[in-house]
Swiss-Prot record:
GO terms for molecular function: MHC protein binding; peptide antigen binding. It is found in: Cell membrane. This is T cell receptor alpha variable 8-4. It comes from the Eukaryota.
């Protein structure tokens, strides 16, 4: 069983009081069996078209960009087999990986800009 830490974050960005954006990650700890599907949930709120990001922080390392959505295809493929699907109607950008590996044990962060 590997443990994926998903810090519960609510990040709010405001520019000049006219654009408010936030992300919410559900669940603070996610345990996944090796070989099982990984699903990390991220919902966002934005008054403008969002740019969405997933970052990972492995033990004793800095943040690393996994993938980003900037307005192209709704399914975004990232590094190490991770992908996320932008769903505007559900205001979601959930991170998935078909098969978890022990090396995936880390902290994952969703962000909006």
């Amino acid at each position: 069983m590997l443990l994926l830490l998903v810090p519960v974050l609510e990040v709010i960005f405001t520019l000049g009081g006219t654009r408010a954006q936030s992300v919410t990650q559900l669940g603070s700890h996610v345990s996944v069996s090796e070989g099982a599907l990984v699903l990390l949930r991220c919902n966002y709120s934005s008054s403008v078209p969002p740019y969405l990001f997933w970052y990972v922080q492995y033990p004793n390392q800095g943040l690393q960009l996994l993938l980003k959505y900037t307005s192209a295809a709704t399914l975004v493929k990232g590094i190490n087999g991770f992908e996320a699907e932008f769903k505007k109607s559900e205001t979601s950008f959930h991170l998935t990986k078909p098969s978890a590996h022990m090396s995936d044990a880390a902290e994952y962060f969703c962000a909006v800009s």
